[in-house]
Regions:
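A conserved beta-strand-loop-helix scaffold within acyl/acetyltransferase catalytic domains
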Residues: 3-48, 52-65, 110-113, 118, ...
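Active-site/acyl-donor-binding loops of N-acyltransferases
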Residues: 18, 32, 47, 111, ...
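Catalytic phosphate/metal-binding cores of nucleic-acid and nucleotide-processing enzymes, i.e., regions
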Residues: 70
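A gly/proline- and charged-residue-enriched helix-loop-helix capping module
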Residues: 75-138
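Flexible, glycine- and charge-enriched loops at secondary-structure boundaries
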Residues: 81-85, 121, 125, 166, ...
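Aromatic (often tryptophan-rich) hydrophobic motifs at membrane interfaces
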Residues: 87-90, 94, 231-248, 254-269, ...
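Helix C-cap/helix->beta junction micro-motif
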Residues: 98-99, 183, 339
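A structural signal for short, well-ordered beta-strand segments and their strand-loop junctions
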Residues: 102-107, 188-190, 343-346
C-alpha cells in the first residue's frame, strides 16, 4: 500500500463512487473552509493502481502556531479493516507532525450500530464496534461535543411510494400536510437573489430558539458551490393572502369558529375570544400591500444517496395556522422519491430518544413522517481526536482546563 496525495478531481472521482459519504467530504467544502483560513489537502491509500481510502483534510494554525488537521465527515475508509486504518492514520499523523500539526480531528460518516426508529438496537442488525476498537488502538479518543450531530433521524425510501409513505405517517402529520394544502400553501425553490428571504426567517427563528444563525454570506457561498452541481436546494413555503383567507373562511361555520378564533383566559376567570393570527396577521400584511407571505424555509443537501434536511426556520406568527413546515418536508420527500434517493435524512437529534428531554419534540416531529418500517435513528461513530504532538497537545489540554476553572 502507498500513502499518496490526490488532486481535488481525483478525490471527487473516488468519493462519488463511495457508498457512505458526506457532503462535508467534498472539494466544495474544502473551498468554503479555504475562505475561512483553512488549507485543504487530499490524501489517499493506493494499492495495485486502485485507491482504497481517501480523505479531504483541512489544516489551520490553532495553538501557539501549531495546526489542527480536521477531516469533516471523514475519512472515507473501511474503519473495520484494521490493516488499512492503521496504515492510513499512521501516515496521516506523520504528515501532520512534519507539517506543524499538533492534533488530528476526525468525524467519520460511518454508522456505529443499527437502530430502529425508537432508537433501540435492531436484533440481528450490524454492529461496527470493531471500527471503534481500531480507532482506540491508534490512540483516538471520542469527543463529547462533535461539530456535526452524532445522532440523526432518517426515512428509508427504498421500495417506497408516495402513497405508502403518506398512509404510514402519523395521523396528525397527515392532517397538518392536508391543512397546509387546503390553506393554499405552495412550496418553491428560491433563487440566489432571494436568499435574503431565507436568511430573514432563519434569523428570527434563531433568536426565538436561542441558537446562532449562519450569516447570509454562508448561505450564498453554499449556493454558489453546490447549486451548479444540483446538490443544494433552498425552498420556501408561501401562501397568497386572498387564497388562504378565502379557503379559511369557507370552512363550515362550527369548524371555522374553532379554527379562526382562539380563547384566552383573563384574570377574573372569564373567557374572551380574539381573532386568530391567520386573520390578524393577514390583515396587518394587507395594509402593507404584501400579498404573498413567506411562512417557512428549508435548506437541503442532495448529495450521494440521500437528501439531508440541514437548516430551516418558520415565521412563528403563522406556524400553527398554516403548518407550512410540514408541507416543506412532504415536498422534499416526494422530490427524493422522484429522483431515486435511497434515504431522506431529517438530520440531527439530541441523542437517543428521551421523552424527558426538552428537545424530544424535534425527534417526535421527524418521527411523525415515518413508520416502524421506514423510520430509524442513525448513530455515527462520533468525533474523535488523536494527538499529533504530545507536548503541544497536553499543554493545550492543560490550558483549556485552567481556562474553564
Amino acid at each position: 500500500m502507498n500513502f499518496i496525495t490526490l488532486e481535488p478531481e481525483q478525490f471527487r472521482k473516488f468519493a462519488d463512487k463511495y457508498p457512505d459519504k458526506s457532503f462535508y467530504q467534498t472539494p466544495e467544502i474544502a473551498n468554503l473552509r479555504a475562505e475561512n483560513g483553512w488549507t485543504p489537502y487530499y490524501f489517499g491509500v493506493e494499492e495495485n493502481g486502485k485507491i482504497k481510502a481517501a480523505s479531504m483534510v483541512v489544516a489551520k494554525p490553532a495553538f501557539l502556531g501549531k495546526s489542527i488537521y480536521y477531516a469533516p465527515g471523514g475519512p472515507l475508509i473501511d474503519y473495520e479493516d484494521e490493516d488499512l486504518t492503521t496504515f492510513f492514520f499512521k501516515n496521516l499523523k506523520n504528515y501532520a507532525k512534519s507539517h506543524n500539526g499538533y492534533l488530528l480531528h476526525i468525524e467519520p460518516y460511518y454508522e456505529k450500530i443499527a437502530r430502529d426508529r425508537d432508537g433501540e438496537p435492531v436484533e440481528g442488525g450490524f454492529n461496527h464496534e470493531k471500527a471503534l476498537q481500531n480507532l482506540r488502538k491508534l490512540g483516538f479518543t471520542e469527543l463529547s461535543h462533535p461539530d456535526e450531530p452524532k445522532y440523526s433521524f432518517a426515512l428509508e425510501l427504498k421500495d417506497q411510494t408516495e402513497e405508502k409513505i403518506f398512509a404510514d405517517m402519523k395521523r396528525n402529520t397527515r392532517n397538518h400536510i392536508r391543512k397546509a394544502e387546503k390553506m393554499g400553501v405552495k412550496v418553491r425553490e428560491l433563487k440566489r437573489e432571494e436568499l435574503g428571504i431565507f436568511k430573514q426567517i432563519t434569523e428570527s427563528t434563531s433568536t426565538r430558539r436561542n441558537f446562532t444563525d449562519k450569516p447570509l454570506s454562508y448561505y450564498e457561498t453554499m449556493y454558489d458551490l453546490f447549486h451548479p452541481r444540483g446538490e443544494v436546494k433552498f425552498v420556501v413555503a408561501e401562501a397568497q393572502l386572498e387564497e388562504s383567507i378565502s379557503k379559511h373562511c369557507a370552512e363550515p361555520e362550527e369548524k371555522a369558529s374553532k379554527d379562526t378564533l382562539s380563547r384566552s383566559i383573563i384574570a377574573d376567570g372569564a373567557i374572551t375570544e380574539r381573532p386568530s393570527p391567520v386573520t390578524t396577521g393577514a390583515r396587518e400584511r394587507s395594509e402593507k400591500d404584501v400579498s404573498l407571505i413567506p411562512l417557512s424555509v428549508g435548506m437541503f443537501m442532495t448529495y450521494g444517496d440521500e437528501v439531508i434536511y440541514l437548516f430551516s426556520g418558520s415565521d412563528e406568527k403563522y406556524m400553527k395556522d398554516y403548518n407550512a413546515q410540514y408541507l416543506i418536508q412532504w415536498h422534499m420527500i416526494k422530490y427524493a422519491l422522484e429522483k431515486g434517493f435511497k434515504r431522506y435524512n431529517f438530520y440531527g437529534i439530541q441523542g437517543l430518544p428521551d421523552k424527558s428531554s426538552k428537545d424530544y419534540g424535534i425527534y417526535d416531529f421527524k418521527k411523525g413522517f415515518t413508520s416502524t418500517e421506514t423510520g430509524r435513528v442513525i448513530e455515527l461513530l462520533g468525533a474523535h481526536e488523536l494527538p499529533v504532538s504530545s507536548i503541544f497537545y497536553n499543554l493545550h489540554q492543560l490550558l483549556s482546563k485552567l481556562k474553564h476553572h
